[in-house]
Amino acid sequence: MTLQATPLNAIHRALGARMVDFGGWDMPVNYGSQIEEHHAVRNDAGMFDVSHMCVVDLAGPNTRAFLRGLLANNVDKLQTPGKALYSCMLDEHGGVIDDLIVYFFAEDRFRLVVNAGTAVGDIDWIRARNEATGSGVTITPRREDVAPAGVPPLAIVAVQGPNARAKVWSTFPSTQPSDALKPFNAVVVQDPALGEVMVARTGYTGEDGFELVVPAASVAGLWEKLQAAGVRPAGLGARDTLRLEAGMNLYGQDMDIKVSPLDAGLAWTVDLQSERDFTGKAALAAAGSRQQFLGLILRDKGGVLRAHQKVITPAGDGEITSGTFSPSLSQSIAFARLPQGVNVGDTVQVEIRDRKLNATVVKLPFVRHGKALVS
């Protein structure tokens, strides 16, 4: 099978990146030292090519009403242009089709950013719901492989870390209007070298920073100038350890079509209280929350917490969904789906290679803005 490639593929290879098959995409896992890339983001600034993710533009007078029924979170929270909202998109049974970010620009203009591996299915689902509801929304995917003919494709670079925003501003003065942005807000600016740039104060690392959406034709110039300014390229390996420390779910690992957001630590993204109806609402209300989604820290030596390991508790067995060795904490950490009745602070056991090792149950996240929140 031929892997898909982002517009930065040649640059990754020229930098000596170790490339891997990530859901059908040829992506960099690291550029030498995953640990150093991780610490660069926690302490300075790093950047990730996330152009495999897909921007989907929605337009038309009924767009808000359409999204009110499509998403589990309530887009009525979006009243200020540029405001962003994290949400799950569910099927009729309450399973997670995808988790995404929706941006509001005008009553007739919204933007979604969806995950790479689910993008084609997401677009099909959104189009089917649009047709079924008669909403008449214009749906325009902006990734190169799915963009309509004549529509310029977009690319995305995430610049993350305590010094990320300052380095973006110094490198691209056109982005200075983003100085006033609060987290989960975006602004669109015109840059003489890049063209139209969406600057979003969002990320997937637990650090401050921007996600920059630019024309695919301009992204190489963006990357090279940021690297020259001291922003360190970072791969999927560091992205995974950073998001795990930050308590951020990964679709396909921590939740999927078979998992309710209520069992994936995402109840805060679901609006069940308002009268608004949305796909999956009835199923969620009927099922409720069956399991807890909590963190684990391995206390015994001799193993690393990994996905699918069994967690043994007095209340019954649970399962790790994501696990790794945390570079920031120098401990093995994990997310786990655990039975009701397990409490933060409890000691549980994890089966690792036919051994039962002790772990402590903790509240997520583990690290935020460079500071450890657990011990």
UniProtKB/Swiss-Prot annotation:
GO cellular component: cytosol; glycine cleavage complex
Pfam families xrefs: GCV_T, GCV_T_C
EC number(s) per entry: 2.1.2.10
Catalysis performed (reactions): N(6)-[(R)-S(8)-aminomethyldihydrolipoyl]-L-lysyl-[protein] + (6S)-5,6,7,8-tetrahydrofolate = N(6)-[(R)-dihydrolipoyl]-L-lysyl-[protein] + (6R)-5,10-methylene-5,6,7,8-tetrahydrofolate + NH4(+)
Gene Ontology MF terms in the entry: aminomethyltransferase activity; transaminase activity
GO biological process: glycine decarboxylation via glycine cleavage system
Primary enzyme class: transferase
Keywords: Aminotransferase, Transferase
Function: The glycine cleavage system catalyzes the degradation of glycine.
HAMAP family, sorted: GcvT
UniProt cross-references to NCBIfam families, sorted A to Z: gcvT, PRK00389.1
Quaternary structure annotation from Swiss-Prot or TrEMBL: The glycine cleavage system is composed of four proteins: P, T, L and H.
Family: Belongs to the GcvT family.
Protein name per the record: Aminomethyltransferase
Organism, scientific name: Cupriavidus taiwanensis (strain DSM 17343 / BCRC 17206 / CCUG 44338 / CIP 107171 / LMG 19424 / R1)
Gene that encodes it: gcvT
